[in-house]
Amino acid sequence: MSTSLSAWQSLREHAAKIRHTHMRDWFTGPQGQARSVRLTVEACGLTLDYAKNRVTEDTLSLLFALARQARVCERRDAMFAGEPVNTTERRAALHMALRAHPGDGYRALGVPVEADVSAVLAQMERFARDVRSGSWTGFDGRAITDVVNIGIGGSDLGPRMVCRALEQDTEPGPRLHFVANVDGYDLARTLARLDAATTLVIVCSKTFTTLETMANARTARDWFLRHGVTHSDLARHFVAVSTNRDAVAAFGIDPVNMFPFWDWVGGRFSLWSAVGLSIAVAIGFDRFRQLLDGARAMDRHFAGAPPEQNLPMILGLLDVWYRSFLGTASRCVAPYCEPLDLLPAFLQQLEMESNGKSVQHDGAALEAGSAAVVWGTTGTNGQHAYFQMVHQGSQLVPVDFIACLQPHSDLPGHHTKLLANCFAQGEALLRGRTADEVRAEGKADEALVPHLVFEGNRPSNTLLLQRLDAFHLGALLAMSEHRTFVQGALWNINPFDQWGVELGKMLARPIERELEGAPPQPHDASTAALIRRAAQFCASTD
């Protein structure tokens, strides 16, 4: 149990000692320059400045001691070795093998996986090339112009985010669309813009039974059949990412066009697998390989760099420091990079579904807070929305600023303004503004002074990418995966299962039948009343 470790107890005492120390005091004179240099780490084209955190040398020493006592490095090595680190499902968590090079030698539970991974990548490459070149055609012989990815959770968020992030430099190819929600509006508005004869659907569901995905897939199939596509032609317009060959064939998809993946690939870690088929189609397979290469570079860094120079290790330790010892409830992710506007949502699933747990590996209750709420939007938009709370609110919210050194457009002056605002926000959170400084500015009467004071002492990381391309994005995402793993190891929880999503899905099935007219089942009074109201409304509109 992590909370019983001596380093954990020492960190509790240490947190109480420095809770009211202001970071401004650590940035005066030469010590500030030394701190900035000491608390900056570079790897894989990423630079992390974590100097603006509420940590001293003693804090860091204790955090690294906690990592040793919690055996984080040994747990990491077990994950890379393909051991069953997903303890509740007795599975390996070997997403790193998806971006491996020949000879890296990954094994899942002792079984080599390189040949299987290589075979699927080759299948993906052929498919992406055929679709992008126009040699894959629809039923009437025309090239595919639009590809719709139907999936949810990890089968949607990761590919959607990557395609959005890298779309600016993508060579011409088919347009990509993503449908996830079972709300019919999501699918209807997408299909309304498309020509069935030149549309291809990728259905992503490991079991081919996911409720939302299969409801959308069946509706899409009906749409094709209403728009001139025959049952025998459906195979030209559907492919599947799944492991359920029989269900895929029964749906009408040629099993030859089924792209498999494995039970050692968790959904939120799966964009590197066949789940990333939409990415390969959108950006081309060469750039998909670059995405994998960036992730592999970060894998090697995480596996081999000492903890004090290890990006995922440092970030995971800081996350636990704030959540478990300083009591923060959330973390803001602010990419000052418009193409990364979906990154906060991706990280939200990655961290909160992985570590939103209250029991440890052995089933014992966790005695510390886990999985901070991850949220945010792009800068500078966030400055005009929620940054008021981050600067002057009553709760402490650590911020991750993410920026790219190379601009994303040729418009003069925009990128310098973007970077200036990013760096200024971090400085403002650190420094704050005292009442004396407000008075010295001479712009406010005394009654207004308290409203213009900024406490400061609000922590942030700044992560700089050399440029936003496939390689650096791959490194950034793999770093986030490993950061999440470090959090879980420190809390002694399993970051690779998600039992918490199951109960609601199970309860939805009988409710759906009741809404369709089946006899009422036992529910709490509130839920029963909601079902009656919805059923009565539906009946009155029939």
Curated annotation (Swiss-Prot):
UniProt keywords (A-Z) are: Cytoplasm, Gluconeogenesis, Glycolysis, Isomerase
In its UniProt record, which GO terms are filed under biological process?
A: gluconeogenesis; glucose 6-phosphate metabolic process; glycolytic process
Name the residues that span the membrane: none
| This protein's name | Glucose-6-phosphate isomerase 2
Q: Which organism is it from?
A: Cupriavidus pinatubonensis (strain JMP 134 / LMG 1197) (Cupriavidus necator (strain JMP 134))
Write down the EC number: 5.3.1.9
Q: Which GO terms describe its molecular function?
A: carbohydrate derivative binding; glucose-6-phosphate isomerase activity; monosaccharide binding
Known function: Catalyzes the reversible isomerization of glucose-6-phosphate to fructose-6-phosphate.
